[in-house]
From Swiss-Prot:
Residues 1-81, 93-188, 329-355 are annotated as: Disordered. This is Probable serine/threonine-protein kinase KKQ8. GO terms for cellular component: cytoplasm. The modification Phosphoserine is found at S19, S232, S238, S241. InterPro entries: Kinase-like_dom_sf (IPR011009), Prot_kinase_dom (IPR000719), Ser/Thr_kinase_AS (IPR008271). Belongs to the protein kinase superfamily. CAMK Ser/Thr protein kinase family. NPR/HAL subfamily. HAL5 sub-subfamily.
Amino acid sequence: MVMQEEKKRQQPVTRRVRSFSESFKNLFRPPRSRDSSPINVTRIPYRSSSTSPKRSSEPPRRSTVSAQILDPKNSPIRQRSYTLKCCTPGLSHPFRQTGSGASNSPTRHRSISGEEQEIVNSLPEYKRSASHTFHGIRRPRSRSSSVSSCDSSNGTTSSSDSQWAMDSLLDDSDNDLTPYRGSNKDILKSKDRAPYNYIDDYNKKALRRATSYPNPLPSKQFYNERLYTRRSHPDEESLESLPRFAGADVQCIIEQNGFKVYEDGSHEHNIKLSGVIAKLEKGNSLPAHRQGSLSRPRLGITLSGLFKHHKNECDIENALSLLPNVEKSQTNHEKRTGQSPNDSNRSSPTQGREDYLKIVNPDASLGSDELKLINSLSSRIHKSLQNYLQEKNLKPAECIGEQAPTFQDNYGHPVGLVGAGAYGEVKLCARLRNEKDSPPFETYHDSKYIYYAVKELKPKPDSDLEKFCTKITSEFIIGHSLSHYHKNGKKPAPNILNVFDILEDSSSFIEVMEFCPAGDLYGMLVGKSKLKGRLHPLEADCFMKQLLHGVKFMHDHGIAHCDLKPENILFYPHGLLKICDFGTSSVFQTAWERRVHAQKGIIGSEPYVAPEEFVDGEYYDPRLIDCWSCGVVYITMILGHYLWKVASREKDMSYDEFYKEMQRKNQFRVFEELKHVNSELATNRKIALYRIFQWEPRKRISVGKLLDMQWMKSTNCCLIYDST
């Protein structure tokens, strides 16, 4: 008996591989840091497929996979066999191809043909080994799978086409996929199709992986629209040169009003399209319109009262751009290449002058080029307004002596109403796509049309001419410089609304912007409140992280928004957030300044205004009021209503209660009662909220430091940003 027990102790203990459910004790734990962390990416919003087989709790330790490889030149199908070797959990899995050198392999062997030997001889030395071992890097599993041709008798999967190696393995420790990153780089130069999805079948005691490809690669426009993932690789291989990987299904564990959370912690947004664009996409053609008019679209819906024609309405048929031709051509070139065409040869416009100012802040959005554009636009707007006030029906200055493209040539015609502002309405315009249009598209589009948001700016009879001119110029310059920022090779932020052009007509000015088809955050919250619902905390966290990154981009380039509120936050259906309306933005630092300019006075909408703005004569940092506004926006998303109407103890009892509780208990009841999916996220969020809602500006956290807090670091966002 003693001898038997001694033998049992000496025998190695066989550890069972952890099952999928055991690997995720905490579904929403913070992601592990990895050397190959993705930058500037958008997670692929794959949908869960109900057709994929379910896996049992224990995967097999060894499996054989057979793949049919079809030579495009010769019709016979050759059969290859592969061996999957299971490794220690946490390490990358080797994937061995059996051949003449793999004598110990349990799978059957096949001699290499003469044609294949020529291919092997043409490869570099490091690729000629008879038994190839492929190692990979981790990559998240996708949420869709397609069924390949499977042989259930021997646990193999067959697929067709040539030179495709096995692309991934399943890591037993955490069910991450380890994709192959080897010779695919050379293969993909001559291939334009992606492999089949890979299917697991743990119930059959075999791990089946096969490759084939009728699925085309996603077009470049999806990558540029940030619908697909961009990841950094050691060999500088972009995702556009790699096949889209589709692995095992991931189960959806939370679904609330179109928002889905999956068991790997990722999520998917499904925001409804606005009513105007939903109507247009159902029809086969654009609605009829009066030629050149911005005011009488026919949508087939009850909007006739909004589009009654008036004598003073804006006809934009002859509206022309106010941007100088040189500036516009350089802007178009910068959109494509990221640099100015004459950067190497062009000298500074002020070179040689004794009073030339040295640029000390090259990252500032407002530099010498923007200053020249401001002067040019101001003079043209002043001249046009003088002609308008004197009732001189003159053509725009740009149309004299040159054949410039009109508004209708570049942006089409109006098809609907989006909203209204202080100085005019915002309309939706659409233009047919043509051969010159190629990805990336910087605004919403479908298979036939490209859509633009057009804001009509017209002075009121009693408005101050100088103030109106300043507002138009500053709003366009700030939005244009932020959305087309290409200095020092840097790309614009994905969370800033693109501003394309400003045009003038005989009686008004027209600003052309990017169109976001899912509407604004205010409309989203109103719609949910009618259904007695609210945003899920994980969805609100994702929106908050995007908002903070957009605001940080503005602050890094010397601009504070100063009017952050749900009405100025727009969305795409897949959850991409855009910050808009820079009419009240403040330039606190230019390219020639080192210090930050403080400001005073109330700016913005009262529920989102920081308390220091209500102090008469007090100067404050505009960056800190943006941080306060972001906090109010987040609480509004979570609660579905304001915390208070005004952040002033004298004017609002709710704010006074918040102030007293913080003074007496050093905590606020509303923040303490907020729930999240787990206690860790709830605690981290609560700590961040207390840092945001500090009524003393010197104690308030900045946007950059807020992004470095554990709450935001552990938040899964639709976009993964560059840490630099």
